[in-house]
Amino acid sequence: MKGSLRTAEGSRAAGAGGGRLRRGVKALVSTGDAVLLIREQHDDGSTFWTLPGGGLRDSEHPVAGLRRELREELGAEIVVDGPTDRVWYAHHSRGRTLSSYRVYDCAVASSVDPNPAEGTLDARWVPADELPPRTLPQVRSLLERHPELPT
């Protein structure tokens, strides 16, 4: 990639912009009636709803990272069907960081128990047409792009 450099975390940073690209994974988990969302908190204390998942570690395989993230955030074991989409997040609390999250279709194979120690304040099964206020716009757009999801 022209004008980019590798950071210590193995991600690419935009040369001219001085920003950083962070790789991550998100789980799109559906029961047939609802989608699993988690509530997290910004650095300023405001909360938001998003899909479970997070950043990948250096050299971590995306599916292994997704399983690790759901264990950490929700104590949940998952079955990963396959990649379905990609979403982008600009993290204002992380300096000039742009995150690229690969989204995977998943099913949970255990109970879901939010872990506040990992920043997961709540978890809910929500119909896609009844998203709570403060659901991230990237999540709303993703669900709109996938009308096959439950409503």
Where are these regions (language model features)?
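Acidic, metal-coordinating catalytic segment for phosphate/diphosphate chemistry
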Residues: 1-26
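Active-site-adjacent beta-strand/loop module that shapes the phosphate/pyrophosphate-binding cleft
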Residues: 87-113
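A generic structural micro-feature
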Residues: 17-21, 48, 94-100, 117-120
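NUDIX/MutT-family hydrolases
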Residues: 102-105, 114-147
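Conserved Nudix-box catalytic region and its N-terminal flanking loop in Nudix hydrolases
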Residues: 30, 34-72, 76
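A short coil-to-beta-strand element that immediately follows conserved catalytic motifs
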Residues: 77-86
